[in-house]
């Protein structure tokens, strides 16, 4: 077993703090409307330019293993916030850094780390409740547009295009972001359907850069049973191969010999094919297969109605303009189904919703209705260069996550104001001992850090602005974009409650673990093996004369 290096107490925490600060200092320069860019060197291609906190965090690895542990723990904060709400990564990082820095000062002054952590946790629970009380539900398009604008680093065109997309396909509709061909952003709304089933084998993937299967103008075979015998598919595969089009198979399952043969055919380029499981279970699966059949003008091959898979023809197959399959989802775009048939199917589902007495059934029927009637919105990003395109695409995806979060839990005043107000709401909170109360104060001070950082990135004096905001009430705050004070909601500076809440919770969770760390263990650096000694000349061989 390799030797280990161990650090204890203050030595460990000092190293860890150094790593935390390196990562957080790189991330926090991106915060706010006047946040700066970070340029990241890549081992191949040109550098990446970004204002996205989690992208910056993911790139940072430090030489010193103890410092790197601190950096990786803060990276976890950014990743968790990104996974939960899709935004708020920089805010979460700033909060974590502030809690760790303030907390370690208190520990150095002799306070109990466990009580300090309990105080921080108590403050966060109370602050989350205060945030929820201050939250305003998002009901109109204007609010959605404002949230999108803020999340895309104050890019109004992004806010507008997301609001329009949500208006077209509904808040629960499918919205995808693609790289466009023009210089300006475009929005396409196409009839489509998404369901939660991914490819059955990663060998079907044909877009390695994003790990998806993309099929253009495919035939779609719908089968209401498990397929394990390849002989059942041979007729269909031969007909599709002759047509030169790709094939998507949606069945209860495709396994064994059948799946292996499909993979081999796909890899050899004989026929471009992919297979996914049908969505749902039991009767719901049958109904959803029928929905796909209506959308794509296909027929569900079902033995219940006397159809055999071996006898399926091209006429039984559905068709669509495009299919995109990821690890977990399948999107069928622009099926060739007749509009009248789709409308009839939609009316039928609406009737079932009205007749149903079960809330669960109603919810599932509503989902089917959204898939059939909603369609898919595609936002095509326009930019002058590839570097700008990548940076902008990441921002739009962030903004899309944020607007969904806003619709889910509502919005609060942006610009760090909501956290300042939450801190004021809990200022009289006390712990069961002095150290816990100090932990509460650590959290309260840390909740001012995002506002301070936004102001610092603008080049203004953070303490002066914070004092002015504290003296106000409600949504009164500082608009860092134009250096004015006023009602943040009225000025359109909003943050989704879910983003602010999850940033605070994840920051406190990971920071609490760091504060209660007493030892750190890592592999000791290994000395390179010494070179073999020089053997020199083989002396002493003289005096061997006279040998015949």
UniProtKB/Swiss-Prot annotation:
Q: Which PROSITE patterns match?
A: CHAPERONINS_CPN60
Q: Does the keyword Magnesium apply?
A: no
Subcellular location(s) of the protein? Cytoplasm
Cystine connections: none
What Gene Ontology molecular function terms does this protein carry? Answer: ATP binding; ATP-dependent protein folding chaperone; isomerase activity; unfolded protein binding
Q: Which PANTHER family match?
A: 60 KDA HEAT SHOCK PROTEIN, MITOCHONDRIAL
Indicate what this protein is called per its UniProt record: Chaperonin GroEL
Q: Which organism is it from?
A: Colwellia psychrerythraea (strain 34H / ATCC BAA-681)
């Amino acid at each position: 077993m390799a030797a280990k290096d161990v650090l204890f107490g203050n030595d460990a925490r000092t190293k860890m703090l150094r790593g935390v600060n390196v990562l957080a200092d790189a991330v926090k320069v991106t915060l706010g409307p006047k946040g700066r860019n970070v340029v990241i060197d890549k081992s191949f291609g040109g550098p990446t330019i970004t204002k996205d906190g989690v992208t910056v965090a993911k790139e940072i690895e430090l030489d010193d293993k103890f410092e790197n542990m601190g950096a990786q723990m803060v990276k976890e904060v950014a990743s968790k916030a990104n996974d939960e709400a899709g935004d708020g990564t920089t805010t979460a990082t700033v909060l974590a850094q502030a809690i760790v820095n303030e907390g370690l000062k208190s520990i150095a002054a002799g306070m109990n780390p466990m009580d300090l952590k309990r105080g921080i946790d108590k403050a966060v629970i109370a602050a989350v409740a205060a945030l929820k009380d201050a939250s305003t539900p998002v009901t109109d398009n204007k609010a959605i547009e404002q949230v999108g604008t803020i999340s895309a680093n104050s890019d109004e065109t992004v806010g507008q295009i997301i609001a329009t997309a949500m208006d077209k396909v509904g808040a629960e509709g499918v919205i995808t972001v693609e790289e466009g061909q023009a210089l300006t952003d475009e929005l396409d709304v196409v009839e489509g359907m998404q369901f939660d089933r991914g490819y059955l084998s990663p060998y079907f993937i044909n877009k390695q850069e994003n790990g998806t299967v993309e099929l253009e103008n495919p035939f779609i075979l719908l089968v209401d049973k498990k397929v394990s015998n390849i002989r059942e598919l041979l007729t269909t595969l031969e007909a599709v191969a002759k047509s030169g089009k790709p094939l998507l198979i949606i069945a209860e399952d495709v396994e064994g010999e059948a799946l292996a043969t499909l993979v081999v055919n796909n890899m050899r380029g004989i026929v471009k094919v992919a297979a996914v499981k049908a969505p749902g279970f039991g009767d719901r699966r049958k109904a959803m297969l029928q929905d796909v059949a209506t959308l794509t003008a296909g027929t569900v091959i079902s033995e219940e109605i006397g159809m055999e898979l071996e006898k399926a023809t091209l006429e039984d197959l559905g068709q669509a303009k495009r299919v995109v399959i990821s690890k977990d989802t399948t999107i069928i775009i622009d099926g060739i189904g007749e509009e009248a048939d789709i409308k009839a199917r939609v009316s039928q589902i609406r009737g079932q919703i009205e007749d149903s007495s079960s809330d669960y059934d109603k919810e599932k029927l509503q989902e089917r209705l959204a898939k059939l009637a909603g369609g898919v919105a595609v936002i095509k990003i326009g930019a002058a260069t590839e570097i700008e395109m990548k940076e902008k695409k990441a921002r739009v995806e962030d903004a899309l996550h944020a607007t969904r979060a806003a619709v889910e839990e509502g919005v609060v005043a942006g610009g760090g104001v909501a956290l300042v107000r939450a801190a004021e709401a809990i200022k009289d909170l006390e712990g069961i001992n002095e150290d816990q109360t100090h932990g509460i104060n650590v959290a309260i001070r840390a909740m001012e850090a995002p506002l301070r950082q936004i102001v610092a990135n603008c080049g203004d004096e953070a303490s002066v602005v914070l004092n002015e905001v504290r003296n106000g009430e409600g949504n009164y705050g500082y608009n860092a974009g134009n250096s004015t004070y006023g009602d943040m909601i009225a000025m359109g500076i909003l943050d989704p409650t879910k983003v602010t809440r999850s940033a605070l919770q994840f920051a406190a969770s990971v920071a609490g673990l760091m504060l209660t760390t007493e030892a750190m263990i890592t592999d000791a650096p290994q000395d390179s093996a010494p070179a073999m000694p020089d053997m020199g000349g083989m002396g002493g061989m003289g005096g061997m004369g006279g040998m015949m």
